[in-house]
Amino acid sequence: MQTYTTQMDAARKGIVTPQMETVAKKEYRTVEEIRQLVAEGKVAIPANKHHECLNPEGIGSMLRTKINVNLGVSRDCKDYNIEMQKVMSAVNMGAEAIMDLSSHGNTQPFRQKLTHECPVMIGTVPVYDSVIHYQRDLATLTAQDFIDVVRLHAEDGVDFVTLHCGITRKTIEQIRKHKRKMNIVSRGGSLVFARMCMTGNENPFYEHFDEILDICEEHDVTISLGDACRPGCLADATDVCQIEELVRLGELTKRAWAHNVQVMVEGPGHVPLNQVAANMEIQKTICMGAPFYVLGPLVTDIAPGYDHITAAIGGAVAAMSGAAFLCYVTPAEHLALPNVDDVKQGIVASKIAAHAADIAKGIPHARDIDDKMGDARRVLDWDAQFACALDPETAKAIRDARLPEDDHSDTCSMCGKFCAVRSMNKALAGEYIDIL
């Protein structure tokens, strides 16, 4: 029996893994199509060998658009019970991935709970954990310290890790020279940048990339190449710093693939609507079709409290134009750690964006549920409409709180007997149409 190290290694050897079979069924594709796409790096199936309860998903522009939910504790909000409520909400609402971005206390028990109990893909950002794991100042951490935390997360079963490998000491010169309005807004990227400035040392994730690849190959961890220089405002979109880093991420993608390590590439950020599609095309060219994982992008800077909407607008265009993976954004973005309701609103907005893009791209069977909704609405079958809804609970609650009168209970309180659907059904059936 032929053995393999990673999903990519298996695919290149002609082996169809159980994970590939699952993805093929979900995506209405042949297993050979999925195997070939994984072999080429155009589809990633993040699936750590230790995440035994995982229900695997494929991430690629030609597949259904997937969404990720960020959560985790901070120094100011450190109740893991609340974070587990967010986890359950994410799983129940159909999110395909969860990233634990915890930045306070002992993070390992929560991370292990996720990989032992949660069926969706789990991701982390090891650089966050480095400072709190060792309880030492950033400047005192060695390159080996950072590498060991990557190994710890891999051993704990996380399916993908965001690593800010693309910024180097050259980036310090670029940031100072080009004077961005928002500098670096990536939390992980800013930590790497700060350490380089304080110590004079190179980015450990870049300098020791081959050692990190060995870890990822051993445990089959997908690398999500973090974009430290993603634009944090419209003024910085598609600038020299962003593109220079993207070119380096393309080079690192080749190196990872040479080790049979799967790759996703992270992208912006804050981007004007007219630049979103172009950003997707640039990434596809530079990174050779590796799955693109975008934060939003947010298409305006002026909507704190509503950034789940600005991100959904950008996310729909991005996914339609080639992005494979959307990181959700909540109403609390730029303001606070999201609460349970914020998380739900963020998931709904991102799921709408992903679904709308899948319809536009012609993803197999993406529109089936919309057609079922149309059928249910035509016959005023409310239970069937709720069954088709992205969020049935909310839809039913709104209707139940404002029911129409009994003599037109098949309609809603917006139109009552003026309901166009009711009138057309009666007219086409040859029935008398009572309005008053």
Language model region names:
Residues 1-5, 436:
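Basic/polar N-terminal segments that are highly enriched at the extreme N-terminus
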Residues 1, 11-15, 404:
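Short acidic alpha-helix initiation/capping motifs at coil-to-helix transition points
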Residues 302-311, 317-363:
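C-terminal catalytic subdomain
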